[in-house]
UniProtKB/Swiss-Prot annotation:
GO MF annotations, alphabetized: ATP binding; tRNA binding; tRNA-uridine 2-sulfurtransferase activity
Localisation per UniProt entry: Cytoplasm
Top EC group: transferase
Enzyme nomenclature, EC number: 2.8.1.13
Family annotation (Pfam families): tRNA_Me_trans (PF03054), tRNA_Me_trans_C (PF20258), tRNA_Me_trans_M (PF20259)
Descriptive protein name: tRNA-specific 2-thiouridylase MnmA
Feature type site, description Interaction with tRNA: H124, Q340
Reaction(s) this enzyme catalyzes, per UniProt: S-sulfanyl-L-cysteinyl-[protein] + uridine(34) in tRNA + AH2 + ATP = 2-thiouridine(34) in tRNA + L-cysteinyl-[protein] + A + AMP + diphosphate + H(+)
Function of the protein: Catalyzes the 2-thiolation of uridine at the wobble position (U34) of tRNA, leading to the formation of s(2)U34.
Lineage: Bacteria, Pseudomonadati, Pseudomonadota, Gammaproteobacteria, Lysobacterales
Organism: Xanthomonas axonopodis pv. citri (strain 306)
Annotated active site: C99 (nucleophile), C195 (cysteine persulfide intermediate)
């Protein structure tokens, strides 16, 4: 068996299948590697075995070697324990960002290099370019599928060793390529959600690791409205799952989460979807990561996303002495959530990002006892 120059992360999905096919068409000596990142206990719907069989089948069609690596231990210690700690603290984490940084572009890269490969390739919708002496992370051509948001923690070492073969394709084109190439995954549905939860009820799953305490649901004036099953099951702006029935003297309208008092186990709700209590003009992050290794300037203007697939929002960024950033948006943002990722862009280039630590949303700021001042970036 010849040494592969490139190892492709084959997930058993259509995206990684076409990524491998494109490289094979170019005559590159490649191999496929399937990563198992969660030790499924049989009660979920991760479908890891089905995905593995599909990955084996794709490698067979392409005539390339197949490899398997179990990273479930690394995933548990590097991703899942952080996921639980964030929820326990009342924040809403994004495990996909951490999985990319710690597993797919660290442990997977190490495994590929151990096989003798120079580079790895994945089926992410993103692009890499080398400009001005630095590697740049760019959005995928299909803006509806772009995954640069989840890749913003990558750096120069990872990007120098990474290929995104499908980054220049639209999803519809990719499906046609897969069908024409006879790839067995051409009609396979895209995976959704977090693998380790699968199709399970989120509360049931999280409750296995974080025992919940019931508590009060209150309106912004502090009046008791209902009872919740656990404050960390909910995130800002959420409507589903509150199970608030008819409340005497209140309109028959939906309720939305506008605040979480983790210390006192109280959830605050309002019937205004765009409640002023959910609006933020400023945010404070934890330490930021820059794709090129440094920010463009100490203060600069760019666009930002505070949630995946959110429209770009214009903002001003101030880099602090401790490496964190403070961000001022041109217009108020709804339900900016601590624990989620702030990702910054200059046109098509992803500059980097950080975890959101605090905002100036009135109720959340009061509950957190935040000293964050919007005057810093005004």
């Amino acid at each position: 068996m010849s040494t592969p120059r490139i190892v492709v992360g084959v997930s058993g999905g259509v995206d990684s299948s076409v990524a491998a096919w494109k490289l094979a068409q170019q005559g590159e000596p490649i191999a496929g590697l399937f990563m198992q990142n969660w030790a499924d206990d049989g009660s979920g719907d991760c479908r890891a075995e089905d995905d593995r069989r599909d990955a084996v089948a794709v490698c067979g069609v392409l005539g390339i070697p197949f490899h398997f690596r179990d990273f479930s231990g690394e995933y548990w210690s590097d991703v899942f324990e952080h996921f639980l700690a964030e929820y326990a603290a009342g924040r809403t984490p994004n495990p996909d960002v951490l999985c990319n940084r710690e597993v797919k572009f660290k442990h997977f890269l190490d495994a590929a290099q151990a096989l003798g490969a120079e580079r790895i390739a994945t089926g992410h919708y993103a692009q890499v370019a080398h400009r001005g002496g630095r590697w740049r992370l760019l959005r995928g051509a299909d803006r509806g599928k772009d995954q640069s948001y989840f890749l913003h923690q990558l750096g120069q070492t990872q990007l120098a060793a990474t290929l995104f073969p499908i980054g220049d394709l639209e999803k519809s084109t990719l499906r046609r390529i897969a069908q024409d190439a006879g790839l067995p995954t051409h009609a396979k549905k895209d995976s959704t959600g977090i693998c380790f939860i699968g199709e399970r009820d989120f509360r049931e799953f999280l409750g296995r690791y974080l025992p919940a305490r019931t508590g009060e649901i209150r309106d912004p004036q502090g009046q008791r409205i209902a009872e919740h099953p656990g404050v960390f099951y909910f995130t800002l702006g959420q409507r589903e799952g509150l199970n608030i029935g008819g409340v005497r003297g209140r309109a028959a309208a939906p309720w939305y989460v506008v605040g979480k008092d983790v210390a006192n186990n109280v959830l605050y709700v309002d019937q205004d979807r765009d409640s002023p209590l959910l609006q933020s003009r400023w945010l404070q992050s934890e330490q930021a990561h820059w794709v090129t290794g440094a920010p463009p300037a100490r203060r600069f203007s760019c666009t930002a996303q505070t949630r995946y697939r959110q429209p770009d929002e214009s903002c001003t960024v101030d880099v602090q002495d401790d490496g964190s950033v403070q961000v001022r948006f041109e217009r108020p943002q709804r339900a900016v959530t601590p624990g989620q990722s702030l990702v910054l862009y200059d046109g098509e280039e992803c500059l980097g990002g950080a975890v959101i630590a605090a905002t100036d949303a009135p109720l959340e700021r009061q509950l957190a006892g935040s000293s964050f001042s919007s005057e810093v970036v005004a």
